[in-house]
Amino acid sequence: MVFVDEAGFRLLPGLVLTYAPRGQTPILDVPFSRDHLSVIGALTLDGMLLIWIQNHSVKGPDVVRFLKHLLARVPGKIMLVWDNLSAHRGQAVKDFLASGAAKRLTLQALPSYAPDLNPQEGVWRFLKYVELKNICCHHLAELRLEVRRAIERLRFKVDVLLGCIRQPGCVIQS
């Protein structure tokens, strides 16, 4: 079983904690920009984390590329659990399944408006509010590097990844 979800990472930092001397407002020197990275992530039951980073919003062909990446790295048949993003239901994914991927891949959509049922959401929370807290980036290339570094650190924290799977609200029976 593999849990898949998408997230956006912006140049604006996710402030968790800040400090300034009494009477002085803390100021962060970051550009106001809507530039962002879109990230597709997959978390397996044994704590393997697969990530795909791109500079644009996730569309159907991007999902297909990620599914090919996933199939190349996870052996055997896969039950894939994800949300109801329109890119997941698009023609590109349907064509990919019809081309033979359905032999190894079974798709299961989560109920609408139930992101807490997807353990991958816990991965995003950990990345944004623990690994990347208070990180200020001025360019997408810098943000991409910081996100990659945070992901690599997280890959070694298998207890955190497994904790995302064991979270309340997500019961998995083997």
Model-found features: residue ranges?
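C-terminal anion-handling pockets and recognition modules
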Residues: 1, 119-174
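RNase H-like polynucleotidyl transferase catalytic core
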Residues: 25-31, 100-119, 135-136
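Single, function-defining residue in the core of a domain
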Residues: 63-68, 72, 80-81, 85, ...
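Extended, low-complexity cationic-aromatic segments
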Residues: 1-68, 168-174
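Acidic/histidine-rich, metal-coordinating catalytic segments
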Residues: 5-6, 76-89, 110-113, 118
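Short aromatic-enriched loop/helix-cap "lid" or pocket-rim segments at secondary-structure transitions
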Residues: 13-16, 93-94, 119-122
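Short, aromatic/basic amphipathic alpha-helical patches
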Residues: 91-101
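Short glycine/proline- and charge-enriched loop/turn segments
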Residues: 19-24, 102-106, 124-130
